[in-house]
Design a protein with these regions (language model features):
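Conserved catalytic Lys-bearing alpha helix of Rossmann-like short-chain dehydrogenase/reductases
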Residues: 1-5, 14, 54-62, 96
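Conserved Rossmann-fold NAD(P)-dependent oxidoreductase catalytic core, especially the SDR/UDP-sugar
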Residues: 3-48, 74
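Conserved beta-loop-beta element that borders a ligand/cofactor-binding pocket
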Residues: 21-22, 59-84, 97-99, 108-115
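Active-site helix of classical SDR
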Residues: 40, 50, 54-57
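C-terminal substrate-binding subdomain of Rossmann-fold SDR/epimerase-dehydratase oxidoreductases
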Residues: 105-224
Length: 224
């Protein structure tokens, strides 16, 4: 799909195209925080490899069309996203919506504790979807160069601290139970956003404010 879209953007002389990538394009063992120049400097995370390769192909295709045909195609790499209309299915949701559902359900049912996988020590970065949209619009208006641009907040938080923040926002008074027998995953995943900052953009929605917004939208859901 992406190859057809990029090619047809060239054929129909689209003035500008923004390709949306993913932070999984970076090597599994890349230094933290992740800088744009770390692309293709090492092996990818095996579980994400096919998806990551497709995204990398899109980035390189945009750069090639820029080089060969002068197309104004740019690429951006967002960090972990959250916000309205997220997926709350505990079988396949991401960590933040899963925690929100767990704490809301526990509060409503009066459960004494909420269980979470692993030790809670891994760190992750979270960007509100509205901030991503604002960054993309800004870059469409101001950025006209090859290569990619990371979009994130430049700060991370441990999963346990995230759970405690969600607990506070939801108003759940029980306890949090970690399960060290379950896998923790990658220890840290943080985007270097110095390039984006130098271009004049910074995220506006704090993590606490963003989670509060989401909570207000979903707090009355009847999950059973």
């Amino acid at each position: 799909i992406q190859s057809n879209v990029i090619h047809q953007a060239y054929v129909h002389q689209v003035k500008k195209l923004l390709f949306l990538g993913s932070s999984c394009i970076y090597p599994k063992m890349a230094p933290q925080p992740l800088k744009e120049e770390y692309l293709l400097t090492g092996l990818l995370e095996p579980t994400n490899e096919p998806y990551a390769i497709a995204k990398i192909a899109g980035i390189k295709m945009c750069d090639a069309y820029r080089s060969q045909y002068g197309c104004n195609f740019i690429s951006v790499m967002p960090t972990n996203l959250y916000g309205p209309n997220d997926n709350y299915d505990l079988n396949n949701s991401h960590v933040l919506p899963a925690l929100l559902r767990k704490f809301i359900t526990a509060k409503n049912s009066g459960a004494p504790s909420v269980n979470m996988w692993g030790t809670g020590s891994p760190k992750r970065e979270f960007l509100h979807a509205d901030d991503l949209a604002a960054a993309c619009v800004y870059l469409m208006q101001t950025y006209d160069a090859e290569g990619l641009v990371n979009i994130g907040v430049g700060e991370d938080i441990s999963i346990l601290e995230l759970a405690q923040l969600v607990q506070k926002i939801v108003g759940y008074e029980g306890t949090i139970q970690t399960d060290p027998s379950k896998p923790d995953g990658t220890p840290r995943k943080l985007m270097d956003v110095s390039k984006l900052a130098a271009l004049g953009w910074k995220a506006q929605i704090s993590l606490e404010e963003g989670i509060q917004r989401v909570y207000e939208e979903i707090k009355d859901k009847d999950w059973r």
